C-alpha cells in the first residue's frame, strides 16, 4: 500500500462527503445515527469477536494491564455505545442556527449562521468506543471524519466502522462521511496532519507524547489539551463541611482522567485545622502526598504515615500523575494561590472552596484555565456534565473551542447579511 496515495484518497473522499453533509437535513443525520445504533446492537457478537482478537494480540505483545483495560469491550459497553449514538441523535442540531441578527443604520440586517468545520481528523489510542462517539458527533455537526485509532484496536475499530457505514447507507448519506484508516503504519498519521487541502482540523486524543508530536508537526489546526494538572484551592473562608468531600471526589473518584485533581493548595490560616483531616482521608484512600515543608510538618504532626508523605520537588507542582499521588502546598493567601496556579497549571480545570463571594469572583476572573469552579469538584469538567450531551475531547487552547468540545465546538460561524436593495454610500 502506498500510504501517501491512500491518505490522499481518504482526504478527497472526505472533502466530497463534507459538502453533502453540510446541507444534509437533521432528519437524515438522525436517521443515520439511529441506524448505526441498530447495526451495532445487531453486530454485538461480531464486535466482541473482533475485540477478542485485539485483546489476544495485545496480551501476546505484552501490553500493560491499563492499556488492555481501555481496549476491552463488553456487551454492556457495546450497548452503551449504541445508546450514545441515539443520545446524539436526540441533541439539537446546531447547523443552520441563525443568531445575533441586528439591523444597521444602513438598513441591512447582519447576523451569524452556524456551519460545519468541514473535515475533522481524529487520532486516538486504544479506546474502541471513541470510533462510535467521534463518528456520531462529527456526523451530527455536519462534518466528515477521518478516524485513525490505535493499532491495538484495529480489528474492533474496523468492525465498528462497518456498522457506521451501514447506518450512513440506510439514511442515504455517503458512506465516506466517516472513514477509519485501515493501516497501522504510523506514516498515515503524518499524512493526515499535513493535508490542509482536505482536512480542516485535527483532534488528538491520547497520551502527552502523541499530542506533542501532532502539535509540532501538524499543518492543520489542532484542538487539544496536553495534560490535566488540575488544582483545588482551599481558601481561608472555606466551608469546612465541603472541603473533604470535594477533595476526595476530585482526587480519588478516578485517578486516570484529565479532570482529576493533581495539586492541592491550602491557605496558611486554615492549613493547621483542615490539612490533618484531608491528609487522613487521602492516606486512607492510599494516596501519596508530596508536600512543601509546611504541609509535611502539619501532616506529620497529625500522625499521617511516613510512607504516604514525601517532599515535593519543583517538578511535582506541574505534574499530571494519573495515579494515587497529589502535590500539596500551603500558600499565604488567594494571591499566592492564583499566582501558583497560573505558573504551574496546564490550563485545564481549577477549583476554589470558599464562602467569600469576592474571593470566588477573583478566582474565576484571574485563573487562566479552560474551566474554573467554585465549591465543586474538578471532575465536573466534562461535556455531559456541562449539558453538551457529549464531547469529542477537552481543549486548553484559547482560540476556537476551549474546555469540553461538544457539537458547537465542531462548528464555526459565518456572517450573513439580509438586504432590500441597499448600497453602500
Swiss-Prot record:
Which reactions is this enzyme annotated as catalysing?
L-glutamate 5-semialdehyde + phosphate + NADP(+) = L-glutamyl 5-phosphate + NADPH + H(+)
Pathway listed for it is: Amino-acid biosynthesis; L-proline biosynthesis; L-glutamate 5-semialdehyde from L-glutamate: step 2/2
A single GO cellular-component term from the record reads: cytoplasm
Q: Which PROSITE patterns match?
A: PROA
UniProt-listed InterPro entries: Ald_DH/histidinol_DH, Ald_DH_C, Ald_DH_N, Aldehyde_DH_dom, G-glutamylP_reductase_CS, Glu-5-SA_DH, GPR_dom
The entry lists its GO molecular-function terms as: glutamate-5-semialdehyde dehydrogenase activity; NADP binding
Per UniProt, what is one Pfam family of this protein? Aldedh
Keywords attached to this entry: Amino-acid biosynthesis, Cytoplasm, NADP, Oxidoreductase, Proline biosynthesis
* SUPFAM superfamilies listed in its UniProt record: ALDH-like
GO biological processes = L-proline biosynthetic process
The record's subcellular locations are: Cytoplasm
Instruction: Tell me which NCBIfam families the record gives.
Output: PRK00197.1, proA
Q: Which family does it belong to?
A: Belongs to the gamma-glutamyl phosphate reductase family.
Q: What does this protein do?
A: Catalyzes the NADPH-dependent reduction of L-glutamate 5-phosphate into L-glutamate 5-semialdehyde and phosphate. The product spontaneously undergoes cyclization to form 1-pyrroline-5-carboxylate.
This chain's protein is named: Gamma-glutamyl phosphate reductase
Q: Which organism is it from?
A: Aromatoleum aromaticum (strain DSM 19018 / LMG 30748 / EbN1)
- Name of the encoding gene: proA
